[in-house]
């Protein structure tokens, strides 16, 4: 029967029809991307606090700041929706921590231990704890959780030879901060993507595992006598920067967050067919999340971090995005903080480098909001 299905239309080219159909679908998707900023505003910010909606034309030098109480109360609804609808959750209860550790490195300034914690049956969290030496008895220090990027390991944040990380976890420990470098699952192409795809079938993602690991890590850190449990900050590069907007948005226990080498106009990063650094042109097929483009981009995730301090580190030569996209998305973050009179609690640093920890404005941001460790 298939042999009878011959094309007998004179001059008809099915390739032309295929191209029209494809370009029509692409045009529809790009029209949704173009309208996604407005869709996200209507979904979250303007719904949680209607006064944030732009008013009439103004020539006033200054506008009245808003009370954040209504926005903070209402935004808990979106925090829950973000975790349940975008990140995903598991029904299983977290296991007792059952911490195990071994000392693996020591310098004149600090000692480092590998630490392993139970999360779920068959699933463990692990990372590198770096304790400054000579912490006085009874002294409680702030912690900076230093998150590696894709295909990285915790030691990458310590070794000076890693140009992207520049030993930032060790450098912060030398300043007197306790640092902890967790291992995240995005290592071993493409095995972690298979895990993400399997989790999709039950409403989860790779970050369902990562968020659970961080909950266990925070619970354990707070048990340490040297740790100030109210001052645990997050600082991540690349996929660790992606973690820096997702995990603290869900877990309020992180007192501030720094996103390095990742802050983006995420919706365009995922769906733009022309941007050379976009996910349409990479092997990272786990990056699309269901309906995320009309719900949460980086500004909205930062809105879930608000009113905690939030900082962005952006290299001019970092190909994960463009300066223009980053500035566009960050402008929404600063406007949100400024609307509530808290613009001093957010910042961005552009530096003349690449996909790297710069450690200048970001370190000063940590000192400002955590205090100088040991003082």
Residue ranges and their predicted role:
Residues 1-125, 280, 300, 306-375:
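Alpha/beta-hydrolase-fold serine-hydrolase catalytic core, especially in secreted/extracellular enzymes
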Residues 102-161:
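Glycine-rich active-site/cofactor-binding loop and its immediate structural neighborhood
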Residues 136-223, 269-272:
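Cap/lid segment of the alpha/beta-hydrolase catalytic domain
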Residues 183, 235, 260-261, 313, ...:
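Alpha/beta-hydrolase-fold catalytic nucleophile elbow
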Residues 209, 256-301, 307, 320-330, ...:
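Mobile cap/lid helix-loop segments that gate and shape the active-site cleft of serine hydrolases
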Residues 226-238:
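Alpha/beta-hydrolase fold nucleophile elbow
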Residues 236-246:
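Glycine-rich nucleophile elbow surrounding the catalytic serine of serine-hydrolase chemistry
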Residues 249-255:
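Conserved hydrolase catalytic core segment
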């Amino acid at each position: 029967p298939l042999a009878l299905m011959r094309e007998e239309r004179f001059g008809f080219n099915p390739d032309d029809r295929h191209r029209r159909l494809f370009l029509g679908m692409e045009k529809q998707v790009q029209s949704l991307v173009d309208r996604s900023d407005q869709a996200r505003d209507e979904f979250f910010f303007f719904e949680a606090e209607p006064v944030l909606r732009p008013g009439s034309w103004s020539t006033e030098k200054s506008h009245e700041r808003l009370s954040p109480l209504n926005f903070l109360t209402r935004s808990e609804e979106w925090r829950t929706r973000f975790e349940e609808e975008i990140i995903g959750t598991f029904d299983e209860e977290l296991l007792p921590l059952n911490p195990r550790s071994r000392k693996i490195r020591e310098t004149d300034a600090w000692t480092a231990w590998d630490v392993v914690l139970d999360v779920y049956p068959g699933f463990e969290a692990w990372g590198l704890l770096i304790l400054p030496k000579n912490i006085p008895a009874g002294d409680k220090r702030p912690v900076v959780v230093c998150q590696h990027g894709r295909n990285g390991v915790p030691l990458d944040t310590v070794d000076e030879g890693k140009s992207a990380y520049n030993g930032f976890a060790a450098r912060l420990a030398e300043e007197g901060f306790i640092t902890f470098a967790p291992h995240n699952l995005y290592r071993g192409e493409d095995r972690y993507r298979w895990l993400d795809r399997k989790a999709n079938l039950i409403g989860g993602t790779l970050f369902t595992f990562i968020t659970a690991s961080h909950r266990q890590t925070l619970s354990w850190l707070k048990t340490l006598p040297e740790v100030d449990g109210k001052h645990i900050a997050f600082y991540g590069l690349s996929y660790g920067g992606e973690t820096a907007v997702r995990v603290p948005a869900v877990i309020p226990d992180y007192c501030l967050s720094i996103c390095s080498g990742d802050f983006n106009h995420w919706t365009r990063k995922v769906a733009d067919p022309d941007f050379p650094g976009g996910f349409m042109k990479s092997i990272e097929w786990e990056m699309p999340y269901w309906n995320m483009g009309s719900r949460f981009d980086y500004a909205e995730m930062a809105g879930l971090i608000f009113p905690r301090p939030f900082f962005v580190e952006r290299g001019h030569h970092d190909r994960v995005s463009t300066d223009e996209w980053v500035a566009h998305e960050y402008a929404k973050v600063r406007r949100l903080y400024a609307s509530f009179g808290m613009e001093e609690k957010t910042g961005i640093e552009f530096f003349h480098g690449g996909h790297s920890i710069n450690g200048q404005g970001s370190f000063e941001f940590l000192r400002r909001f955590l205090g100088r460790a040991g003082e």
